[in-house]
Amino acid sequence: MTGAETSVQLYSVREAIAEDLPGAIARVAELGFTRVEPWGFVDKVEQFRQALTENDLSAPSAHAGLVAAEDVQPIFAAAAALGVQTLIDPMVPAERWSSRADIQATADRLAELAGPAADHGLTIGYHNHRWELAQQVDGRPALEVFADLLDDRVVLEVDTYWAAVGGVSVPELLARLGERVQLLHVKDGPITDDPKAQLPAGEGAMDIPAVLAAAPRALRVVEFDAYAGDIFEGLAASLAYLRGHA
């Protein structure tokens, strides 16, 4: 990967997708994105596949619940059908990050899935929220303990905004995690836990140039958990900012 690669997490436009999946994805492509990160695709895989094909979009990564899934095979098959390369679990609840034993259990589960995922051409990853950084185990952020316990085949997608909300220096975190970090969620805002306060990249308190410089080879994935303005305008502004910081 090169640092110039930019994608968008489709959770950002979930309301538009719920109303008109083909139309929403076409609008994302019209903004200038060529890559997307699907979410909620397993039971709509053919609709997503057709929309991606019609708009010349690729999906190098996607989100799906893996750790708690009873049967991962349909998830793997759906991801492979969309050409996904890295399949990322978007969240393990906060209560599962308070002890080393719980963290080990999550790491073990992802390691268990890495082999079967590889049979589908997939790499397994994990995406953080704030609690993996805010909660400490053995005097260190839980996410860093987790990284030490991960199988070498498992990668990280660091949500840079939620990491900052969790109280860490994101550039320093990325430096410590190193090549394990293959993807970044890029977002901006006042660095609070209110999703509706999020802003387009470059308009908030995040030092995004320093963040990008700390992981120059990671795929940049634009995301809004929520946005008070027009979400498509927010995505366009973020993409323009990132193109200016290639």
Name each model-derived stretch.
Residues 28-35, 56-59, 153-156:
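Short, surface-exposed connector motifs at secondary-structure boundaries
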Residues 12, 39-40, 63, 128:
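Residue-level recognition of beta-strand->loop/alpha-helix junctions
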Residues 7, 37, 61-63, 88, ...:
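Conserved beta-strand positions in the central sheet of alpha/beta enzyme cores
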Residues 1-30, 42-45, 80-84, 120, ...:
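Histidine-acidic metal/acid-base catalytic patches
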Residues 41-45, 59, 65-69, 227:
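Short active-site-proximal "capping" loops at secondary-structure junctions
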Residues 35, 67-155, 160-163, 176, ...:
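Active-site acidic/histidine proton-transfer and metal-coordination neighborhood
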Residues 46-64, 106, 122:
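Short acidic, glycine/proline-enriched helix-loop-strand junctions
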